[in-house]
């Protein structure tokens, strides 16, 4: 199951899935976990927006919408939402994997820890930069539905 708030992004992803002969992917439009609240997953992989709103690189955007990259003053607004919401749709001991900026591993780990996640670890990308953090849902972590304000 793949979710995105953008119908255009989902159309591109669906085309990519067809080209890769991936017939078992379901594409659902909606914000983060909202469209899949009735499902349970063992793994969630997310490439959320993680760039600071005032990052100068955003001025050079030609193809991607700003909302696909920018996420608040520190670039972590969407990661905060995911840290809070994903436990509700993960199986016990399920895993969350988040892409983030190379300068953000400590902040992401702190957000996840504060939200009850365990076994938090950051991994380098192919360029050797710390860009992916994984965390396991603590079996005692609350499984409440996301708030309507997220």
Place the predicted regions along the sequence by residue:
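Flexible, glycine-/basic-rich loop-and-beta segments that form/coincide
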Residues: 138-150
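S-adenosylmethionine
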Residues: 1-138
